[in-house]
């Protein structure tokens, strides 16, 4: 091989490496700040949730404390949850210099991440490590579009495909449909109904269920209703109304209380409702990165 050929090969290698670096910098998954609709550069958030008896007696049953820590790019580096003071779950992420997750420790499992490009999309593959039984290692593959939003997700358990979903967004980047590619009939449709005063409803519709979220013009959640369908009958499963909502100076939620109701007629979706009692209280504290 002549010297000129070697130079050409080296140039090709450097060009390929530069292209990969460029794509890495151009495509990053949507930040967790964005997913959680957080305002400002949140360093950590600690959410304390008080869960009360479902009978409406007001008796406190559980206290959940979830602490989430973010890096300066808005991605979660660690999240832990305690229930009544006892550890319940934990996840820890390690990132590379390119800003992408390289390793995840989730409870007792460890995942290593690899990345490739499918056209203009970024594909992340997380493989579970140190699994003795070859039939149970888990592998998850997520595809991100140019805007960083997840557009496809597949999950394998021991080599068997168990999840195959596609995510569809409108022109504003709002999720409108989750397609179940394994069971097309089980897809989820998401729609919005907006009122002239700025209030709106978010309706999530599955084949046998519906979840309706009611929001004030400022984005505060006012009410939530879940409905299950049995043939032609619609049975209300749960109704929650929210009060005592407050936000900090950046606009992030700091307090919310939910009260549970039930319909006077369990098969009548828009009828009168009866108050059961206190359901949950949420308090959230934030730390921010210094500007």
Name each model feature, range by range:
Residues 1-6:
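Short, Lys/Arg-enriched N-terminal segments with co-localized hydrophobic residues
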Residues 25-291:
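Buried hydrophobic residues that stabilize the cores of well-folded domains
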């Amino acid at each position: 091989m002549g010297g000129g050929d070697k130079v050409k090969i080296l140039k090709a290698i450097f060009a390929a490496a530069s292209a990969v670096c460029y794509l890495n910098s151009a495509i990053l998954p949507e930040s967790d700040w964005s997913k959680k609709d957080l305002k400002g550069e949140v360093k950590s958030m600690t959410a304390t949730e008080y869960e009360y008896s479902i009978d409406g007696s007001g008796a406190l049953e559980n206290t959940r404390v979830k602490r989430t820590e973010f890096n300066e790019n808005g991605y979660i580096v660690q999240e832990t949850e305690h229930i009544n003071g006892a550890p319940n779950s934990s996840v820890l992420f390690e990132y590379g210099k390119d800003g992408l997750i390289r390793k995840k420790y989730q409870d007792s499992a460890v995942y290593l991440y690899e990345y490739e490009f499918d056209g203009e999309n970024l594909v992340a593959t997380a493989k579970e490590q140190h699994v003795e039984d070859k039939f149970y290692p888990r592998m998850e593959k997520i595809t991100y579009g140019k805007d960083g939003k997840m557009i496809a997700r597949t999950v394998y358990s021991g080599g068997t495909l168990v999840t195959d979903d596609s995510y569809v967004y409108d022109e504003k980047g709002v999720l409108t449909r989750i397609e179940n590619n394994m069971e097309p009939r089980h897809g989820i449709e998401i729609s919005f109904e907006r009122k002239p005063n700025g209030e709106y409803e978010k309706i999530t519709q599955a084949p046998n269920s519906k979840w309706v979220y009611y929001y004030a013009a400022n984005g505060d959640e006012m009410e939530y209703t879940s409905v299950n369908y049995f043939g032609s009958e619609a049975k209300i499963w749960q109704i929650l109304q929210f009060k005592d909502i407050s936000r900090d100076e950046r606009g992030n939620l700091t307090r919310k209380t939910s009260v549970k109701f039930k319909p006077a007629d369990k098969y009548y979706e828009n009828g009168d409702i009866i108050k059961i009692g206190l359901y949950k209280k949420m308090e959230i504290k934030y730390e921010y990165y210094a500007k």
